[in-house]
C-alpha cells in the first residue's frame, strides 16, 4: 500500500510497504528547474558527495562502511523528467528481518551523513574530488556522440525545443563543466539543499510511520528556505512548418529521427489512448513500424517510437541505409496516417493493450521502476499510481486511438548521413 506524507517543509515521502522482496530501496530526489546554467553543476553534486564525508573521508572508507551494512549499495541519481532535473541518491539494502539486526536505520544515517556532512577543504568541496568528478562528467557528456542513436535523438530535441528548457541535456553541456570550481559547486549545493522541493521514495517491509520517524531524525539538519523554487514542464504545441536538420559524420548507417507533438501529457484524460497509439505505431514488436517498415519492407535496421509523457512529444528513431532515408520517412508517415484513419487490426490493437498491461504488471514487481514512475509523477505534479493507469488503458477504444493519432503532428526531422555521397 502506498502512503504519502510531508515530513518537513517541502519534503514529501512516498512509502510502499511490501514483503515481496528481500531488499528494501530508498531514493532522495532534489527537484530543480532544468536550466543550462546549473544543469552540469547539479549533475556533479551527488558524485562529489559520494567521494567522502566527515566520518568516511574517501572511497575506501565508504566501501568499508557499506560492507559493514551487509553489502548495502549507494549511488548517485541524475534524472530528467520533462523540464525538471532531479538529483540525489538511491540505496538498496537487506531487510532487517533477514539480517537479524537493524540495517535500515544505519543505512539512512549513512545517507544523511553523505548528504549533509560532506568532507570539506578550506570551507568548500575537496578540489581533488571536484576535478576528478568533472573529468568523469565531461567524459560521459562527450561519449554521447559515440552512440549515434542517442546522439541523433539529442540533436533532434535540441532543434525541436530550441530556446526551451527541455533542450537542455540531462547532464548539462560539455562546455559548462570545466568552469566549475569547488567554491562555486559548494555554493550551488547549499542552495539546492535549502531551496529545492525534495521527494523521498521508500519500498520495503517497514511501515510508513517507522520510515517517516527515521527520516525526520536523519534530515533534521536539512536547511529549508521560506519558499521553494517551482518546477514544471511547458507542453509542446505544434503551430509551425516542419523543420529539417541534417548532419554528416563518418558513419556507415544513417539515422532518421522524427519529432512529433502529441497535444497530450500524462494526467490528461486522453493519455491512456496516446500510450496505446504509441505501442500500435512503434512501441513494440507488434507495432506497425516494426512489422511493416522494418520486417516487411526492410527499410530500417530498427524503427521505434517513444513518448515523453511530461512534455507532449513523440520521437521516432530509426537506423536506415543512406539511399533509403527518404523512402523510410515516407513510409513512417504513412503508418501514422493509417492509425489516424483507424486502420488498426484487431491483433495490433489487442497486442498493444496487452503489452502495456503486462509491462505495468511487471513494473509492480520492480522497485526501481516503481521508484522511477512515482518520482516522474511527482515531477509532473500528478498523484495517480500504475493501477490507475492500467484501468485507463483497459478502457481505451480503437476510435480513441485513432483520435489520439489525429492530434499527433510532425514538427522536426533530423537526419544523420555519411560524409560521402
Features from the language model and the residues they span:
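Short, flexible, solvent-exposed loop/turn segments with mixed acidic/basic and small polar residues
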Residues: 78-81, 186-193, 304-307, 402-406
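Glycine-rich, mobile lid/loop segments that gate access to catalytic sites or pores
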Residues: 137, 143-145, 160
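Short, low-order "capping/linker" segments at domain edges
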Residues: 139-143, 240-253, 358-367
Amino acid at each position: 500500500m502506498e502512503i504519502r506524507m510531508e515530513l518537513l517543509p517541502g519534503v514529501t515521502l512516498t512509502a510502499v510497504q511490501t514483503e515481496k522482496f528481500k531488499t528494501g530501496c530508498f531514493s532522495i530526489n532534489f527537484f530543480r528547474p532544468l536550466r543550462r546554467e546549473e544543469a552540469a553543476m547539479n549533475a556533479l553534486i551527488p558524485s562529489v558527495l559520494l567521494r567522502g564525508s566527515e566520518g568516511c573521508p574517501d572511497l575506501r572508507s565508504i566501501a568499508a562502511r557499506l560492507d559493514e551494512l551487509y553489502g548495502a549499495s549507494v549511488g548517485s541519481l541524475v534524472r530528467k523528467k520533462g523540464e525538471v532535473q532531479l538529483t540525489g541518491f538511491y540505496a538498496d539494502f537487506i531487510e532487517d528481518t533477514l539480517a537479524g539486526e537493524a540495517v535500515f536505520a544505519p543505512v539512512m544515517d549513512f545517507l544523511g551523513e553523505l548528504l549533509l556532512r560532506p568532507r570539506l577543504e578550506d570551507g568548500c568541496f575537496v578540489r581533488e574530488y571536484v576535478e576528478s568528478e568533472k573529468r568523469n562528467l565531461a567524459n560521459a557528456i562527450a561519449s554521447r556522440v559515440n552512440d549515434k542513436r542517442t546522439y541523433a535523438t539529442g540533436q533532434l530535441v535540441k532543434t525541436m525545443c530550441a530556446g526551451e528548457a527541455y533542450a537542455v541535456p540531462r547532464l548539462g553541456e560539455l562546455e559548462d563543466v570545466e568552469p566549475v570550481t569547488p567554491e562555486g559547486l559548494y555554493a550551488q549545493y547549499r542552495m539546492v539543499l535549502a531551496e529545492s522541493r525534495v521527494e523521498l521514495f521508500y519500498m520495503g517491509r517497514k511501515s510508513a510511520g517507522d520510515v517517516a520517524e527515521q527520516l525526520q531524525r536523519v534530515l533534521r539538519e536539512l536547511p529549508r528556505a521560506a519558499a521553494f523554487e517551482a518546477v514544471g514542464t511547458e507542453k509542446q504545441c505544434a503551430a509551425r512548418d516542419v523543420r529539417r536538420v541534417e548532419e554528416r559524420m563518418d558513419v556507415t548507417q544513417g539515422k532518421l529521427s522524427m519529432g512529433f507533438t502529441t497535444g497530450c501529457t500524462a494526467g490528461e484524460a486522453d493519455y491512456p489512448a496516446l500510450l496505446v497509439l504509441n505501442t500500435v505505431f512503434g512501441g513494440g514488436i507488434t507495432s506497425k513500424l516494426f512489422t511493416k517498415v522494418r520486417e516487411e519492407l526492410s527499410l530500417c535496421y530498427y524503427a521505434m517510437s517513444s513518448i515523453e509523457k511530461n512534455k507532449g512529444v513523440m520521437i521516432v528513431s530509426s537506423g536506415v541505409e543512406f539511399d533509403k532515408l527518404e523512402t523510410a520517412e515516407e513510409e513512417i508517415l504513412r503508418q501514422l496516417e493509417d492509425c489516424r484513419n483507424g486502420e488498426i487490426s484487431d491483433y495490433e490493437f489487442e497486442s498493444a493493450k496487452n503489452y502495456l498491461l503486462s509491462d505495468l504488471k511487471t513494473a509492480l514487481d520492480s522497485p526501481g521502476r516503481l521508484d522511477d514512475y512515482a518520482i516522474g509523477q511527482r515531477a509532473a505534479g500528478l498523484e495517480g499510481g500504475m493501477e490507475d493507469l492500467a484501468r485507463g488503458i483497459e478502457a481505451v477504444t480503437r476510435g480513441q486511438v485513432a483520435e489520439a493519432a489525429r492530434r499527433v503532428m510532425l514538427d522536426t526531422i533530423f537526419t544523420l548521413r555519411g560524409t560521402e555521397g
